[in-house]
């Protein structure tokens, strides 16, 4: 967060635009902190994170997505801020628990450690992919061999109407 970003949060909040911040791991900025990792793993880093929460709160944000923050740190920060804390991989001590639907439904091959799959959509997608390929190959084969389209998939003018049509063409 920069001083300018807090000015923007403040400006938006003063105009009654709800602002939700994003603290902890911010994947697009992960190279700045040494990669995809928990944020707040030392006392100093946890306190710095707490200060960011307070600055966000003071600027007028109503909430913050709290991504991959140690659970005990998240619990203490959540107790000490009035903004709604939304845990994404930050344990159960935030105000709201959040996961991506893809993770909940088991729709990813390598889900993040902090997620939990409650279904197995990936298996179903694989089955759909196999069935789709089977259908497309059968369609190609029938199209090349002349089996498709067949009489059931085609229509013709009745004989007199077709002859009239041919006369009109000439």
Q: What name fits each language-model region?
A:
Residues 1-121, 125-170:
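Alpha/beta enzyme core
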């Amino acid at each position: 967060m920069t001083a300018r970003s807090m000015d923007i949060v403040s400006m938006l909040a003063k105009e009654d635009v709800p602002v939700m911040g994003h603290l902890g791991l911010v994947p697009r900025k992960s190279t700045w902190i040494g990669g995809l990792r928990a944020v707040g793993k030392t006392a100093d880093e946890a306190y710095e994170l707490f200060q960011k929460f307070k600055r966000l709160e003071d600027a007028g944000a109503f909430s913050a997505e709290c991504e991959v923050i140690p659970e005990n740190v998240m619990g203490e920060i959540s107790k000490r801020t009035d903004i709604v804390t939304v845990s994404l991989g930050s344990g159960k001590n935030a105000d709201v628990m959040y996961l991506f639907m893809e993770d909940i439904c088991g729709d990813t091959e390598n889900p993040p450690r902090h997620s939990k799959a409650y279904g197995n959509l990936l298996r179903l997608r694989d089955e759909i992919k196999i069935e789709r390929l089977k259908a497309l190959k059968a369609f190609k084969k029938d199209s090349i061999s002349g089996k498709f389209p067949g009489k059931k998939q085609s229509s013709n003018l009745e004989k007199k109407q077709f002859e009239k049509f041919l006369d009109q063409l000439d």
